[in-house]
Amino acid sequence: MTMEAKAILRTARISPQKARLVADQVRGLPAERAVNLLKFSDKKAAHLIKKVVESAIANAENNQGADVDELKVQTIMVDEGPTLKRFMARAKGRGTRILKRTSHITVVVGAAK
C-alpha cells in the first residue's frame, strides 16, 4: 500500500484558469521543492496552493508518520467551484453580469518511489 495524504481547499476565490497555471508548475515535484517554488512566486494562486500543499504534507507527517524528505506532489487538481454572479451598471440603464469564479484545489502527496 502506498502512503498518500490529501488536502482540499474548497471555494477559493480565484478562477480555475489562473490557478491551473501555477498548479502545472508544481505537479510531480518533490514536496519541499514545490513549497519553495510557490513561496517565491508572485501569483495569487501560488499563495493559496502553497497552503494546500503544506496542509497535505502535515497530514502525511501527522496521520501516517511519513518522512517529509521522501514526499512528492503526486496529484494536483484545480476544479471549478460555484460561480458568484454580480451585476454591473452600464450606460443607458443597462447592466452586465460579472462572473466571480471560484476553485476547488486538491493536492495529494505521497512517498516518492
Swiss-Prot record:
GO terms for cellular component: cytosolic large ribosomal subunit. Transmembrane segments: none annotated. The keyword S-adenosyl-L-methionine does not apply. It comes from Stenotrophomonas maltophilia (strain K279a). This is Large ribosomal subunit protein uL22. Keywords: Ribonucleoprotein, Ribosomal protein, RNA-binding, rRNA-binding. This protein binds specifically to 23S rRNA; its binding is stimulated by other ribosomal proteins, e.g. L4, L17, and L20. It is important during the early stages of 50S assembly. It makes multiple contacts with different domains of the 23S rRNA in the assembled 50S subunit and ribosome. Part of the 50S ribosomal subunit. One of its GO terms (biological process) is translation. The keyword Methyltransferase does not apply. GO terms for molecular function: rRNA binding; structural constituent of ribosome. InterPro entries: Ribosomal_uL22 (IPR001063), Ribosomal_uL22_bac/chlpt-type (IPR005727), Ribosomal_uL22_bac/org-type (IPR047867), Ribosomal_uL22_CS (IPR018260), Ribosomal_uL22_sf (IPR036394). Belongs to the universal ribosomal protein uL22 family.
